[in-house]
Amino acid sequence: MLLGCAQLLGERTLLITQDELQGKLATMFPLQRKVLEVFNFTVDTPTVTLLPESGRVATHLGVTIQDRLQGREYRGAMEISFALRFDAKGMALRLKDVSVDSIHIDGISAKTQRALSQLGPMIAHDKLEGQMIYGFKPEDLARADGLGYTVGAIDVTPQGLSIRLIAKP
């Protein structure tokens, strides 16, 4: 009976605004990762920009790198962009197709900067691909599930992330 309700009511949309997404991300940072057992990366809270024309989200991240071998610290910034996928089992939005659009670290040589720019995409894929960006509480989606809805497409709009709820097949 409830499945019929979803089919009669049609598609629904859940909107996560840019501010809500920014707030959710703020709770996950700073983020620390070791790379090659030589570098400690600390990533500050990102600034989110929605890219509706490409269906992606961009973030500007402040970065601190500690070189454990030389005992030096470097600061800089990184721009990444990504698409999103819904993980039904984990009830979360996760990063997919992560791209490092630019990386600049102050105080390093041009040669090291080039090497870091080449390593950046590999590091981003290894450390960020599939990373949860937004988690839902069970009750967030329980009502939709009870009415016969499931998560469909995720669209990036100027207003935020538009998550389509569609009738279950």
Predicted regions and their residues:
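Sec-dependent bacterial lipoprotein signal peptides
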Residues: 1-3
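Extracellular/lumenal and peripheral-membrane lipid-interaction modules
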Residues: 5-169
